[in-house]
Amino acid sequence: YRVPPGFSTTRLSLVDRGMIYAIAHVRGGDDMGRAWYLAGKTTERKNTFNDFIDVAKGLIARNYTAAGRISVEGRSAGGQVMGVIYNEAPELWGAVLAGVPFVDVINTMVDETLPLTPGEWPEWGNPITDKAAFDYMLSYSPYDHVTAKAYPPMLVSAGLNDPRVTYW
């Protein structure tokens, strides 16, 4: 999972208007090699979320932006990151875009009838056979951590025919 490098006229247009554009290369992505990827999977998954929040705090500390003025976007597993950071540090974000987000981690990963669930167990862990994996997933699952508090605006999109992230 990563944002491929490349030129984007959309990004250039944002920068020309005074916006700052940053990409967070968090653990769990393959941008920095296999060890970096492994440091963000299964029982190390929280590193991904912490890294993302740390990047935002670093941008704030260096006066590139301020808390509440950062817009973020992620899709699928990146949408899961959006869900976690939304719950963990809502004060940092001005807006959150989550495309087909994987936010109901527990119900998805315990339903082995879903076509992709068994194949994802090596990446996330198997909560059916491993209580520690279940507890770890539950500790960050965005769906299971929504509380009554102030949240920034969020746009969520779903795919009617997405086999990885169901729309319900």
What are these regions (language model features)?
Residues 1-9:
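Short, surface-exposed "cap/lid" segments of acyl-processing enzymes
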